[in-house]
Amino acid sequence: MYEIRSAGPKGLGVFAKSLIPRGTRIFSERPLLSLRPDQSASDIYTLSRLLAPKDRQKLLSLSSHITTSLTFLRWNQALFYTLKSLFKNFPFLLPRYCHFEPHRPGIFQSRNSLREHVAILSIFRSNAFQLATKEIYQAVFPGISRINHDCVPNAQGNWSEGLGRFNVHATRDIRRDEEVSLSYLGDVAALRDARWGKLKDGYGFECGCEACDLGSDVGRKGERRREETRLLLGEYAESVGNGGEKCVEKELETMVKFIGMLEAEGITGREVASM
C-alpha cells in the first residue's frame, strides 16, 4: 500500500504504492515509546533503555530537529539525569568506586552514552504525538513518525483507546506515488506566517505545500479565505465576550462559513465532523 523512501529536503517520507481510497486505514501502530501523564522528560531516557535492541534501533533511526539552544538544553537534561542517578545510588556505590580506575566502567554515563541520551530526547520531542489520554500523554510510533506535514493533509491520525493503537486513515483518495501527509498543527485557520513560525520553532522547517505558496493562485485564495474566516470568528467571539446576547442564527452562520472555508481548502476529517 505504501513505502517509506526519500522525500527530498524533508528526509524520508511515506508514499502510496498504489491508489489509496478515501477512508482506508494506512497505519495502525502501538507506541514505540510513550510517556504517562505522571511522567516527564527526565523519564524518556530511562524508558528507552527498557526497549528491545530492535526497537531501540528503530527509535534511533528517526530524525530530529536540533538547534544550538535545544542541544544545550538537552545536554543539560542528560547531565542532570546522570547527577540525579549518581546521588540516588551514591550510598551503595561509594565503596566500590572510592578507588578510581579509568579503564573500569563507572556510575557516570560515558560521553557516547550522553550523546545517545541527547539524541533520544531530541528524537522523542521531534516525533511524539500528544495523545493526552488517561494512560498515555505523549507517544512515538515507528512508521507513523515518518509521515511528513502538509497544511492541507490527505490523512488524519486518531488514537483508539479500545485497540491501544494510533490509526491513520486517508481523508481523500491518495494517488499512486503521492506522499501521505498529516498536519502537525492544531489551528487549521492559521495564516501562512503563523503556521511557518510554529513549524520552524517546533520542527525546524518552513512548509512548502500548495497552501503556503502565496505566489500561486491557490495559495493566495486560501490565505484570503483564512483571513476572512479569522476576522469573522474574531468578531463573533468579541461580541459574545463583551456580554452581547448569544444569537443562535449568528453562531450557525459563523460555523457554516468556517466549514465552507475548510471544505474550500480541502481540509476534511475531525475538523469538519466536530463542528
Task: Mark where each language-model region is.
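Conserved catalytic SET/PR domain of SAM-dependent protein methyltransferases, capturing the structural core
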Residues: 1-275
